[in-house]
């Protein structure tokens, strides 16, 4: 019997990804809103397959983001960091960021 996988995404993460669509479009990273939506949909698709992706332990100094993390290289220039907690087959996605954020220095420890 296959156990059910439950993936819960914190509201702060969904809000961030919703805003990301608008940001990518208005800052002209994408010429069409649909392309920005597709970009974010690909991130969601990656997250929903978290159970099949090798994850790493988060360094102690940033475990407030989550005890584990995975990385997703969506483009040549952008690496996404997805932080989460896990118990059995339940995953709580707590934080998402990328290497372009203003204070990305903490990501260098990963």
Give, region by region, the residue ranges found by the protein language model.
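An N-terminal domain-start capping segment
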Residues: 1-2, 46-49, 100
């Amino acid at each position: 019997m296959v156990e059910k996988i439950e993936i819960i995404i914190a509201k702060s993460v969904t809000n961030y990804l919703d805003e990301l669509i608008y940001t990518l479009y208005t800052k002209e990273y994408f010429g069409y809103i649909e392309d920005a939506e597709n970009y974010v949909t690909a991130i969601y698709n990656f997250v929903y397959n978290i159970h099949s992706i090798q994850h790493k332990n988060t360094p102690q100094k940033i475990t407030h983001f989550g005890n584990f993390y995975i990385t997703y290289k969506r483009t040549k220039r952008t690496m996404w960091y997805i932080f989460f907690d896990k118990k059995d087959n339940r995953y709580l996605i707590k934080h998402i960021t990328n290497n372009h954020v203003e204070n990305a220095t903490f990501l260098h420890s990963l």
